[in-house]
């Protein structure tokens, strides 16, 4: 599983129809975090950007959901077109449809926080500590 990097998560997700369904939202965000951000190969098959190979049991283990909860959440995401799942006897291929809409290539659009806008964030050790001093 990827341990570095980040994903973009637009605030419009707050208005998404599945946002209030914790299991479905959790699975979708987990897939956004774990699908390939660039094409890879796995055991002789091409796994494209926005895809990953996993089983329902693996996703359940990674998310803390039960297999039944993952299956139900996946059905929600498939029904509304966010995710496609192709199952074989050996693996499952999960695809976040329209991945580039969620995670565009290149630099994000819009204003950027931090020094480019004249705002300097706190560096390491500069956050307010428990002693009340900066």
Describe each region flagged by the PLM.
Residues 1-17, 33, 37, 47, ...:
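An N-terminal low-complexity regulatory-tail signal and nearby short nucleic-acid-interaction modules
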Residues 5, 11, 93-94, 117:
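Residue-level marker of intrinsically disordered, low-complexity segments enriched
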Residues 9, 24, 66-69, 110, ...:
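Intrinsically disordered, low-complexity sequence elements enriched in Ser/Thr/Gly/Pro
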Residues 12, 24, 43, 105-108:
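A generic structural signal for solvent-exposed, polar alpha-helical segments
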Residues 17-18, 116:
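Short, surface-exposed loop and linker segments with low hydrophobicity and enrichment for Pro/Ser/Thr
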Residues 18, 22, 35-97:
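Winged helix-turn-helix DNA-binding recognition segment
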Residues 27-31:
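Short alpha-helical "packing" element that flanks the helix-turn-helix/winged-helix DNA-binding module
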Residues 98-134:
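Charged low-complexity intrinsically disordered patches
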